Every structure is written in C-alpha cells, then in structure tokens.
Amino acid sequence: MAWYDEARFYHIYPLGLTGAPQNNDYSEPVNRIKELTPWIKHIKEIGCNAIYIGPLFQSGSHGYDTTDYKLLDSRLGDNEDLKKFVKDCHKEDIKVIFDGVFNHVGRDFFAFQDVKQNRENSRYTGWFCNINFWGNNEYNDGFSYENWGGHNLLVKLNQRNPEVINYILDVIRFWVSEFDVDGIRLDAADVMDFDYMKSIRGLANVVKEDFYLMGEVIHGDYTRWANNDTLHAVTNYTLHKALYSGHNEHNYFEIAHTVNRLYDMAGGNPLGLRLYNFVDNHDVARIYSKLSNKAHMIPVHILLYTLPGIPSIYYGSEFGIEGNKENGSDASLRPQLNLKDYKDATDKNPLTKVIAALGKIRAKSPALSYGGYTQLQLTNRQYAFSRNVNGENVIVVVNNDDNDCMMTLPSNSVEEYVGALSGERIYAEGGNITVNVKACGGDIYLPLNDVMGEYKPVDYSKVLKEVEKQAKKKVKEEKKDTSTLPKKVRNVPYEEMTVEELQACIIGKMRNNGEVTDEMKRTVMENVYHDSLVNWVESFR
C-alpha cells in the first residue's frame, strides 16, 4: 500500500502561521519558514505523519495569486530554507505535500505581464482564457479575461494549451527535484480541465514513487475526480458539513446518510474512493466556533479519525482555538501562532491530549485505514459502526446526548475488547457486547490481543468540564436569505445561468429529494462561485 493510505495529515497555512505580511513588496527574503521547525516535533507528538502546507510560492498577497512557481515566497524565505524544512520533516518520517495553484495565476505572473505590455502581439495570449481586447476591467488594463470566482486578481490559465500544460508539468518536476516533495494538493480542482489533470496524474505516476495528488472539490460526484486516471483523493466537504451540523442538530442520521452515500459511491470498497476528511481548514470557520455545544469536539474528532477516509487536523484546532470569517476576510481563519504559547499541550490541554490519542490509535489499527465499514446502530443521538480488515474488527461508538447511554452491539466473534480511549475491557456475551457511552463522548473498541497491546485511558471529562463553564449557545451565523432567489429560472444551459439561478436550481433539486433544512440552504447560499455551482447542479442524478 502507498504511504497516503495510512496518512494522518496536519494542515499548515504558512503565511498565516508565521505572521508574514499580508501583501508582498518583493523585498529580500525573510526566513520565516524556520519558525515551523519546532512544529515538526509537535505534529509527530499528536500522531500525524504527513503535512499539507501551502501556498508556498512567490505571490502578491494571500498566496493563491502566484507570481513565480519556482521561488519560495520571499516573505517565508528562499528555496534553501524550504529544502531544509522538507528535509527536516523527512528525518522524522513525515511526508510533505505542497499546495499546487495550477488553475490560475496572479497578475504579476510573467506571462500575464507580457500580455499587458504587448497586448495582441504577446506570444502568451493563448496562455489565458477568453482574453478580449475590446473589453476592460477594474484595473483599466484595456482588455478583459476569464478569472476564478469573479476575482480579476486570479487570472484563469488556458489548461488546453500544450505550452501551459508543459510549463506546469515542468514546475512539478522542479518541485520534486529541488524540494523532494511527496505530493500536491490541487487548488480549485473542481473547475480545472479534466484532461489537464490527467496529464498531471500521468507525471505523478512516474515522477516519484507514490506521488500523491489530492484535489479541492466542494460538491458533486467525487468519483469524477478521484479515480485511477485523475486524482488519488479529493476534499470531503460533504462529510465536513455533516459532522458539525449533525451534532448541532442532534442528528446522526445526517452523518450516517452521508457516509453511506459516499461509501456506496466508492462501490463499497474503503479504498475505492479515497477522501481527505477534515472538520475545518483555511477557508471555513474553525470547528470549535461552529459547534453549538463545545463538548461535541470529542465525538466529532472520534468520527474524523475512524470513518473511511484520510483524517486531517488544521493547525491550531487541536488546541481548541476559535475562528470565524469576519467582514468577508479569511484572516481570522489563518492566525499567527507561537508554539511556545501551547507548551506541553499534549499533557496540559485535554483536547490536544484526546486528539493525540486518536492519532496514535489510528496509526496502530490497520482496520481504521483499510477496513470495510458496517453500520451497527443509529439513532438521532447515538451512532455505532465497525471497521474490519483481515480479521481485525474495530467498533466505534459516539453519543451526542447530554446523558450517558447503554448500547448493545454485535461482537463479530471477538471475545474481548478494550476501549482505546477509556481503557475499559468489555467481554462478549451471547455474541454481543454492551457498552456504556459517556455523554458527549464515545470510544473505539479494539480486539484485546498481543498485537494491539494495552491502552492507557484518556480522561476527556476534563474537556467536558471546561465546556460546562460556558453557556451552551448556538454559534452566531447569519441565516442567508433565500427570498431573493428568482421564482422562475430561465430555460438556458447551466453555464449561462446567474449565480442566483444556479442556487435556486440546486435548492429545487434538493427539495425533490426530501426536506431541505436551514443548514442545507445556508450551504447553498454561501457558495457564490459560478463554476462550482455548475458542477454541483450537474451532480444531481
């Protein structure tokens, strides 16, 4: 199996974590990336064995407006500094994947600057999409062009141009030869050309053993992207949404339905559809901020580490930090952190201790990486399932209620289990085990044998006690008003519809499938990206 099948990712947004200036003046490099070195030990301590880091390369602002793909952003240092960071990670057996922003470039990118200077005579006009020298934009370029997400700061690359394809493939070869990177996360993969991505996959298959490609996909049929010809994995936004709303609404049916649908999409094969599971990242609110009852941090993370897929922790969330978008800005989601402020967190911070335990449990159990999934019991407030591979059967239980509960579950021919979090030994009787699941908690029951060994209990009651000091209140989220959506939608191709028409279509198709909750409406209304909405509406069957 490949390394990524057993990966436990730690996600770093380096410009934020290191406190780099928001705008790049392209001055002399400042080695801020060295500030990440102490984090390597911490990342290993919490049981992660892979880092997704980015964006990294020279850009004008947030990192996604690339200026130079072969030069580390000068706000972070120079190429030698990045080489050292990756080498230090590899010494600790930690893999590293970079953020590959290959859908669009920044306005300072050399080829776009040539178009600005030479207009129709530029040899690079074919590198970009839909350049119109009769148009204009807010920069008064005297021409218009296709962008990403309505932002002219991000210039869409023509991904069917052989020169563009070869240029990006050369960038990837350079990243491997120069930095020894282990894979790439493709930004905005859900709006990238499929043949373009297949060319990237073709290179990935030969450029380095087990070179990993993971794509950012918001909605749709994930198998269109994650397959043997395109990408190895995609971001699991569907589960991300279900994990927090399923707890906020005390509705484990939403989570189980999501898991079953994704598992069926993969043909019932746990490795048939590799998904990158997460509860927060650099684009969405922190999980601690999204949860109405902060005690649900425990069952949420138990599920993150035990459901099919590859788990990921976003830097700082293991400490329980908060973060919401403010005035449309992502800055509060990408804060500067000093690891010294969280010294000995794996001993002193109860939440960090639980997440570290989950990482180590995941590392020791092949069933949690490779095992099949079977739902055992489901109510609004309790959920149990098993993961099984090569005779190893693991049972996972979670409870979102404020009271303990008893659950009786099939033992699957295992005579004795041990709770990996509680340390509790459970004996099977009559082919079943009966377990007491703590309020706002859960456990992972592993077969007691010599291979798995003994487990020291993790007392997550301290997390719950801290939460009890806070008033249980709903996270303040403005409900998006759907009354502004058009009553009638034009009979035109989806590509020609407005954002509002696409949103109305999606909500209408959701209604055809059943009740549409406020959470579902809000998810639709928060997506204002035309290409993403087109992909979403086309995913309904």
What are these regions (language model features)?
Residues 104, 168-194, 277, 281:
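Active-site groove signature of glycoside hydrolases
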Residues 7-11, 50, 93-97, 183-185, ...:
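Structural preference for beta-strand elements that scaffold enzyme active sites
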Residues 86, 90-92, 116, 177, ...:
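Active-site-proximal helices and loops of the catalytic beta/alpha 8
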Residues 270-292:
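Active-site clefts of carbohydrate-active enzymes
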Residues 1-52, 58, 88, 259, ...:
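Carbohydrate-interacting/catalytic domains
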Residues 1-9, 13-49, 56-178, 200-206, ...:
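Substrate-binding/active-site clefts of carbohydrate-active enzymes
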Residues 482-541:
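Basic helix-extension-helix modules of the SAP/HeH family
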Residues 12, 43, 53, 69, ...:
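Conserved, mostly hydrophobic/aromatic
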